[in-house]
UniProtKB/Swiss-Prot annotation:
It comes from Caldivirga maquilingensis (strain ATCC 700844 / DSM 13496 / JCM 10307 / IC-167). Transmembrane segments: none annotated. Keywords: Cytoplasm, Elongation factor, GTP-binding, Hydrolase, Magnesium, Metal-binding, Nucleotide-binding, Protein biosynthesis. GTP binds at residues 23-30, 100-104, 162-165. Residues 162-165 are annotated as: G4. Signal peptide: none annotated. This is Elongation factor 1-alpha. It is an enzyme of class 3 (hydrolase). The gene is tuf. Residues 100-103 are annotated as: G3.
Length: 444
């Protein structure tokens, strides 16, 4: 039995939003996530009572909420349920799916795949002295995660200033953190007036569901209210079907199941679909979300699709599904506008980082530096520069060294924005302006 309850039918009828929970290690992402699930009634009471007793016995009572997530991770690793990849909770208005649960080995890589599907991000920062500072420092993940969230198109951002109990609910500390983060957010072009900064304690439950009496100085929304007030992003239902594959499973008695989020268009039971780059064709047998069978899935839905004609070994994460009469675009070359976030020296032609685009990762070479742009205006300041460096914005021509599906950012942002990573850091982020398509033969 899973520690997490499955959503009810009425919950699944609410509009769906994907929530990425981001922030520096040890700032309390897991504890806050566990607390959110508990407060919204999505944790099995009996299983949680066992965790509580265990935590008490070990003198680690404060760990019980984070342990909800650990237990879930164990369930996943044992392969308990296929849809355990999507854990959710509901507010009066929405059903939220928490994507990319905290605590994976290569967190930033997973964060990119997860955030590329997110409608909103919850940034968790610790108020504990030293912890906040290391998160926004040069090696800190707070800054990097925020940059990635912006680049990946997440405009709905909520900041939870966590561990307020550790600083005795000090308003000055909260204001200081809010001030420093606001500076970073302004540089990234977030509208700071639209970003709620909520002082919380995940361990004590302050300002999660009900207003805390420990912080009478705070007059804003509690966390669940702020989540409920998110503006849903537009769903490109009228565009061609594009579904980047997150995972491929082979299920005994059922066949091949692909999971992922429909980024555009609609897919119905009985449709003939194609997965590219491998150019495999199949028919949709059934569609499921959170244990519920659907006749169709549309942009914004997280689904598992059982496909006749697909074999597990033919497909992988990062392949993209579309309809046979309007297949996804495999790129031979890409023209993109990139912003260099971090690089120790300079970047020239021949540089080959790894591109992360939707759920795909592919080594990609810069084959031409077309121009350097003014970051503020976007105007060209130099044609054919010899090199680009940290802080520069440039138009570049890229060649993926393995086949990959992308779309122009102007056509479909979810498949048109990417980041470039190298040496474990995010070097640059960009948007795809033009594509030279590769020749692909699709055989039925």
């Amino acid at each position: 039995m899973s520690i997490i309850k499955n959503p009810t039918e009425s919950a699944l009828k609410k509009p769906h939003l994907n929530l990425a929970i981001i922030g520096h290690v040890d700032h309390g992402k897991s504890t806050l996530t566990g607390r959110l699930l508990l407060e919204t009634g999505y944790v099995d009471e009996k299983a949680f009572a066992e965790l509580e007793a265990e935590a008490k016995k070990l003198g680690k009572e404060d760990f019980k909420y984070a342990w909800i997530m650990d237990r879930l991770k164990e369930e996943r690793e044992r392969g308990v349920t296929i849809e355990a990849m999507h854990v959710g909770f509901e507010t009066p208005k929405y059903f939220f799916t928490i994507i990319d649960l905290p605590g994976h080995r290569d967190f930033v890589k997973n964060m990119i795949v997860g955030a590329s599907q997110a409608d909103a991000a919850l940034l968790v920062v610790s108020a504990r002295p030293g912890e906040f500072e290391s998160g926004v420092g040069p090696q800190g993940q707070t800054r990097e995660h925020l940059f990635l969230a912006w680049t990946l198109g997440i405009r709905n951002l909520i900041v939870a200033v966590n561990k307020m109990d550790v600083v005795n609910y000090d308003q000055k500390r909260y204001e200081q953190i809010k001030g420093e983060l606001s500076k970073i957010l302004k540089i990234l072009r977030y509208d700071v007036n639209k970003v709620p900064f909520i002082p919380v304690s995940a361990v004590r439950g302050d300002n999660i569901k009900v207003k805390s009496s420990n912080m009478p100085w705070y007059n804003g929304p509690v966390l669940l209210e702020a989540l409920d007030a998110i503006e849903p992003p537009p769903r490109p239902i009228d565009k061609p079907l594009r579904l980047p594959i997150q995972d491929v499973f082979s299920i005994t008695g059922a066949g091949t199941v692909i999971t992922g989020r429909v980024e555009s268009g609609v897919v119905k039971v009985g449709d003939t679909i194609v997965a590219l780059p491998p150019a495999k064709v199949g028919d949709v047998r059934s569609i499921e979300t959170h244990h519920m069978k659907l006749e169709e899935a549309k942009a914004g839905d997280n689904v598992g699709i059982n496909v006749r004609g697909f074999e597990r070994q033919d497909l992988k994460r990062g392949d993209v599904v579309g309809h046979l009469n309007n297949p996804p675009t495999v790129a031979e070359e890409i023209v993109a506008r990139i912003a260099v976030l971090e690089h120790p020296t300079t970047i020239g032609v021949g540089y080959t980082p790894v591109m992360h685009v939707h759920t795909a990762t592919v080594p990609t070479q810069i084959i031409e530096l077309i121009s350097r742009l003014d970051p503020a205006t976007g105007q060209t300041v130099e044609q054919k520069p010899q090199f680009i460096k940290r802080g520069d914005v440039a138009m570049v021509r890229l060649k993926p060294l393995k086949p990959v599906v992308v779309e122009r950012f102007s056509d479909l942002p979810a498949l048109g924005r990417f980041s470039l990573r190298d040496m474990g850091r995010t070097v640059a982020a960009g948007q795809i302006i033009e594509i030279k398509p590769a020749k692909v033969e699709i055989k039925r």
